[in-house]
Amino acid sequence: MSSRGGGVGGRRGGPGGASSVRGGERGRKRGRGALDAVEPRVPLPRGTGSGPGAGRDGAAAPVPALQPAEADVLSGEVETEMAAGMEAREGASSSSSASAPAVGEVEPPSRAVGALPPTSSKAVVLQARPGFGTVGTSCRVRANHFVVQLADKEIYHYDVAIAPELRSRERNRNIINELLRSHKKYLDGRRSPAYDGRKGMFTAGALPFTDREFVVKIANDPERGNQGEKEFKVTIKCAGAANLYMHSLKQFLAGTYPSQDRFSHKHLDIRILIVALNGGEDISATTFYKAQPVIDFALDYLNMNIRDAYSRFDQDGTRVSVVQYFNRQYSYSLKYINWPCLQAGSDSRPTYLPMEVCRIVKGQRYSRKLNECQVTRMLRLARETPEERENSILEIANENNYGNDYHAREFGIGVTNQLALVDARVLPAPMLKYHDSGQEKVCNPSIGQWNMNNKRMLNGGSINYWACLTFASCVRLAEVRTFCKELVRVCNSIGMQITGEPCVRIRQERQDHLDAAVRDIHRQSAEFLSQQGVIGQQLELLVIVLPDANATVFYGRIKRLCETELGVITQCCLARNVQNVGGRNTVLEDALHRRIPLLTDMPTMIFGADVTHPPAGEDSSPSIAAVVASMDWPEVSKYKCSVSSQSHREEIIADLFTEVKDSQNRLVYGGMIRELIESFRKANGSYKPGRIIFYRDGVSEGQFSQVLLSEMDAIRKACASIEEGYLPPVTFVVVQKRHHTRLFPEDHHARDQMDRSRNILPGTVVDTKICHPSEFDFYLCSHSGIQGTSHPTHYYVLFDENNFSADALQTLTYHLCYTYARCTRSVSIVPPVYYAHLAASRARHYLEEGSLPDHGSSSASAAGGSRRNDRGVPVKPLPEIKENVKQFMFYC
């Protein structure tokens, strides 16, 4: 079997040069032709273009489509798999020894002949690793992973069926444990199988049968009123021969296994094994309800108005009160007979319980949104320095004592009790360019931080018409005027241009007049501009001072009203957050001089995408999708957004590409990708992007293939709909923050290995040992810690047609983290993804006036369209954002 090639779209060879078609002639001989085994889709059009969007020889670099490969025969069945890659053009070399480009090199995207995309996410093969990074200062860090030693043993897999079937894993395990005890002579008593509580069992060596049925009797639970025994039939069947060898697994983890993508078994995905064999420990904190009597809870938190204990109901045809019922049934005299009862049943069959007989049991997680005070307390309690966290993890690992687990001994698995020592590198920080009129024109950040002293914005925005409105009764109007003057002074001092006086007088209004006051000040400003003879202009910025109490509710109402109805950008925060006026704080020095490989050589568009979901407990609210994209090339610091609503908890972005028929029955193309590419073209002299880099947040590992298949298809269709043959090469990167990997300095006393918070240095990147041995992923800690333990971000490249080397992509991603508009610090995730999350959170406010802020992540096109969720209920579309607002980073 040949090595893996160029990811989903594939190309001949990929970075390593080997053909990426799996199976080759072997597949043609062993099974039916793979091209017959899959129903092909209509291929996307290919063609040529010109200008900066074109390839090196003047033709547009076409996107290689997704190609089916030959069928593999596994366990006697023919399984159709799609592999990355495709047959090379006629006359092309079948192998190449060219190495991956270094940071300063650019390798042109490979060509491909039209191919067919796969129709199943199971067919997708992820991008192969192009090599390991070398840029930066070498160092070592400790990861909260524990090295696992494997013995050379054969592992056998058995299918288990229990009848009658049970849902409880614990009950299933009890049945298997009883089977092992009572049928020891049939099971080879030396074996200690590992059972997953469902249908899978593994043994270190073969059992003395391939298929056998057993009868197991289990005593019923007397505490539940069940006496006697219950009989179960257990069938154990060999799922295959010795289908997993420890030495093969070790080869895979070392990156030397002949087929890097998976072992030859249809159910065992190697990803599961990597998680199991790269054991990690971490500490998580969450909130729980306090275990206490319900009466105490009601006194502390609730103002309940429910049924009291004197309420009557029918018992055997007799009307009795709750007090009488408990006295007769349980000989229990209620003490608090005037307290209300709890309704513990359903609406159709209510069950009323007195509060005093109920307790809130321990261990119930509180899943709703915490208020600001609770969040502060939670962070304070959960905060641990890196050294404290490392010690806590080691303490837990020693308590668990994995090395002495009987299953570990049975399978020859040894687990170290020390954190894994991992090779890492600290990438150099980028040089930041400021305006030449400032004393400091170029800034070299120190440990991920810098300030605005003696610097001016490179391209500060201008505001000619602004106003201010306050709803904070505790702040005097004179104080608000002083604040506005200081705001104008500070903004002008750092390179912005703001007129000194508002276009209408500063006003103080009552909170219950919010909508009317905002509409009125918008009307007054329009009248002022008309009187001044200003044509085509309107209020550019409305500064709003909010009260401390209920500020969140007011914030949502203001944003919905101003951004979707009035078309006014508002600033409800302090001067340090005034970013929404169309300028740029800073850009990368190398971007201006076009020294960033695979970014500045041709017009490049960087996308960020996220989907956020409603909070727990809401079963009908739509999810929100958001996509942002860079509009300024080569600086890539200004991002336009598109947002849309979609089905409840649907992770795949639905509106990336749309096609509908108009009244004339003609196809009309739309969607978020097309909208943003058209905006890019207008902002860059009619040039289309010749390269796309797509950072996607919120995707779990189990969704990689499905999201990639669907969203890459949408990106290609959107590009092809703009111009025939327009298919720029795409790099698709998943950004993961919700994982449990933590990195610690090797020596907690070496100051040169840490930042001020005693965390690892910003720019620390790891792409070995704790990463996938053959797929393209890396951990990057791009920020300087403030408190607690820093959380590195996991970047996983699912698809790369731009031939990024490890160094090139890692450096680009790290440098982008210095361009976040809200602060003079590098941030922990790449800014396009950060912006997408902010845009999605903002769009959540648009769903309902006065709604509370978002609890998850969101995405894109304001039109949204009318669709139905999985329950057949129409998804409520988002109101459209006014076009003059969308031109700015209003969400930031």
UniProtKB/Swiss-Prot annotation:
**Alphabetically, which GO biological process terms does the record hold?**
regulatory ncRNA-mediated gene silencing
GO MF entries:
RNA binding; RNA endonuclease activity
Q: Please, which domain of life does this record's source organism belong to? A: Eukaryota
GO-annotated cellular components: cytoplasm; nucleus
Record keywords: RNA-mediated gene silencing
Disordered as annotated region, ranges: 1-68, 86-117, 850-876
Compositionally biased region (Low complexity): 86-107, 856-866
CDD domains, per database record: PAZ_argonaute_like, Piwi_ago-like
Per UniProt, residues of the PAZ domain are 248-362
Ranges of biased composition (kind: Basic and acidic residues): 867-876
Entry keyword ATP-binding = no
Ranges of compositional bias, category Gly residues? 1-17
Q: Which SUPFAM superfamilies match?
A: PAZ domain, Ribonuclease H-like
- One Pfam annotation, family name? ArgoMid
Instruction: Identify the residues that the record assigns to the Piwi domain, covering every copy.
Output: 541-848
Name the protein family. Answer: Belongs to the argonaute family. Ago subfamily.
Q: What does this protein do?
A: Probably involved in the RNA silencing pathway. May bind to short RNAs such as microRNAs (miRNAs) or short interfering RNAs (siRNAs), and represses the translation of mRNAs which are complementary to them.
Its protein name is Protein argonaute 11
